[in-house]
């Protein structure tokens, strides 16, 4: 018999200490990694539920195990909410991650060796969009497209590459691009050569759900996303589509299970269902609008302080600061800001002279600080502190002074009150 009062603290002090230290770190550090966010206690309640015990290979109503009548309800709720939120007529909530959702699309629609057009990682793409170290770059013939001198997607070059290489699939989406993608233009290019348009909206799904960023679902053959990041749910993946054939949807389902995964994580799917319901609330739209406002406010300060921002601004939740002219590396900036309790990630910038392990830039995102309650005034103040650190990157007194300010504002704006 398992006693409900069993706990980690009494049983595994070493593990519990690390967990508690991470809790403190999250409360005492300002989180600016664009792919990170704080999920609600309701989502964590779902993830810590007894649903974790249940195997449920298959799909609602078509399981390979018995005893699935209640997890069927859970998964169907998540499916229905995903379809409603994004205006889709197909949803698969089983992918364990965004990368596995992307793997599903590749295996459902392509054969190894097929040609794919994907955004260059150095220009803002993602590992799964064709990086040579990833399955996508190893199994498929990847042709990269990128951004122009203004920092925006070069659609003319994309169209030229498409007509020249005749890819079977074009990938839209990004991990470090601060502009608005013209999904209709991408579909037009895909249709002109008979290619699939696959959109990975992992970074902007929350903005899309709130109507703050254009929805790719009506334009793409298939859309994937993570359920964390701007969507603020549990770590996981999601596949969506609209107007496709039953044959396409069967291919996608089969590529998830049994093609790429076994049993779904029902406790995580419950967390997805909660997050999707939360994303339908009016306050979620207000939150996403503030995410975008805060990003613009921070960019304004960086530009005023003489820092170069890729594309000159942002139209979503993130932006890239190019440090080449400052003779700083992303690695140095990341470390110095970290000592001030400000967490960012080093990031390559277009035409970066440094390696991906060093880089010449940092990526800044506002979902997490906005979740704490920051508005434009706090975002601008924070950007100023970051510039202070970067201007005096070797001055530990400056870094310590900013750390004190960070601790103070974190205490005033706790993650979990």
Curated annotation (Swiss-Prot):
One of its GO terms (cellular component) is cytosol. Its EC number is 2.1.2.1. It is an enzyme of class 2 (transferase). The modification N6-(pyridoxal phosphate)lysine is found at residue 229. It catalyses: (6R)-5,10-methylene-5,6,7,8-tetrahydrofolate + glycine + H2O = (6S)-5,6,7,8-tetrahydrofolate + L-serine. GO terms for biological process: glycine biosynthetic process from serine; tetrahydrofolate interconversion. GO terms for molecular function: glycine hydroxymethyltransferase activity; pyridoxal phosphate binding. It holds the Pfam family SHMT. (6S)-5,6,7,8-tetrahydrofolate binds at residues 121, 125-127, 355-357. The record marks 228 as: Plays an important role in substrate specificity. Homodimer. NCBIfam families: PRK00011.1. This is Serine hydroxymethyltransferase. It comes from Shigella dysenteriae serotype 1 (strain Sd197). The gene is glyA.
